[in-house]
C-alpha cells in the first residue's frame, strides 16, 4: 500500500509542472470539430449553466462574467460574495438573442443542447 501511495505521489510530482504551466497567447482550442483562437483571455463571458458560473467564480474571474443563466440552486457559501452582482439572463434556458445581446467573447455551456 505504501508503495502504491509513493508511486502515485511521484506521478503527481512529475506531471504537476505541466498542469500548472502558464497559458500562452494566442491560444487555440478545438471543440466539436471547430477551432477557435483567442489572442488574449476572454473579458466578456456568458455562462449557460450554474456549474460553469461556479467554476469562474472559484477561479476569481467574476469580473469576466457578462451574464449567466440556467440555475438550479444557491451558490455554495464560499462563492456567494463573488457572485452577488451577477446579471442573470434567465433561471432556465436563455434565448439565443439574450446571449448574443451580451456580445460575449466566449460562451460556456453545460450541455451541448444550449
Task: List where the protein language model places each region.
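A short, structured surface patch at a secondary-structure boundary
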Residues: 44-113
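Alpha-helical transmembrane segments and their juxtamembrane interfaces
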Residues: 14-15, 74
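Bacterial Sec-exported substrate-binding components of ABC uptake systems
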Residues: 2-7, 12, 19-53
Amino acid at each position: 500500500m505504501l508503495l502504491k501511495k509513493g508511486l502515485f505521489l511521484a506521478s503527481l510530482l512529475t506531471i504537476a509542472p505541466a498542469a500548472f504551466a502558464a497559458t500562452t497567447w494566442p491560444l487555440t482550442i478545438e471543440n466539436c470539430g471547430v477551432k477557435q483562437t483567442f489572442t488574449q483571455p476572454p473579458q466578456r463571458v456568458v455562462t449557460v449553466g450554474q456549474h460553469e458560473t461556479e467554476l469562474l467564480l472559484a477561479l476569481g474571474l467574476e469580473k469576466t462574467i457578462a451574464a449567466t443563466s440556467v440555475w438550479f440552486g444557491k451558490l455554495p457559501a464560499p462563492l456567494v460574495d463573488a457572485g452577488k452582482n451577477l446579471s442573470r439572463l434567465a433561471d432556465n434556458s436563455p434565448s439565443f438573442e439574450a446571449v448574443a445581446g451580451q456580445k460575449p467573447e466566449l460562451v460556456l455551456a453545460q450541455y451541448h443542447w444550449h
